């Protein structure tokens, strides 16, 4: 279907020979760095969580994390879709210097994010037994005992974590890629890994489940503090 458009004589798209443009490639890499860090960090975090759970609870602990991580993929996709949907709109309004529209889009994105987080967390909290049962076909009581509190504690991160994802996308879209990269790096790698080891050392599996929520809350607090200080 697309080729038929290109073959028509009355179109404005033509093949052109273009050489490499390092400046453009650099801009693309800079603006996409936050997303890159997020994707790479996911693998590192999963590895660390599995290693800690294997030490604390054996194979059953790893299976319990499998429940939360699989649900987390769906949840992250929703926040990622929201963030990616905002970015072109934010960039357009920023380019037009419509600062009021940029602020309105950010507010709408944040309210939508918190609404999604609230609905998803309430759904997971109320339906924990049913959700865990989907992944516990053998009816293991040990797996259920680990996974049920895991779901309820792990997904407390939705509120601060979703907000961080929206803010990271916002900064990348309005030309402040450094801040967006900083949020992604802190929440995805720099803080979460040591936080997981420290909290699991002192509070066991409960500390591990809470490590993501604690990390995202700390990153959000730091982001809001730096945002406020930059306005002064």
What are these language model-derived features?
Residues 64-122, 126-128, 161-179:
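Small-residue-rich hydrophobic transmembrane alpha-helices
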Residues 1-4, 80-83, 154-173, 179-188, ...:
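Short runs within selected transmembrane alpha-helices of multi-pass transporters and secretion channels
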Residues 23-52, 85, 117:
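Core transmembrane alpha-helical segments of multi-pass membrane transporters/permeases
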Residues 33, 37, 41, 68-71, ...:
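Hydrophobic residues within alpha-helical transmembrane segments
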Residues 47, 51-52, 74, 166-170, ...:
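Alpha-helical transmembrane segments of multipass membrane proteins
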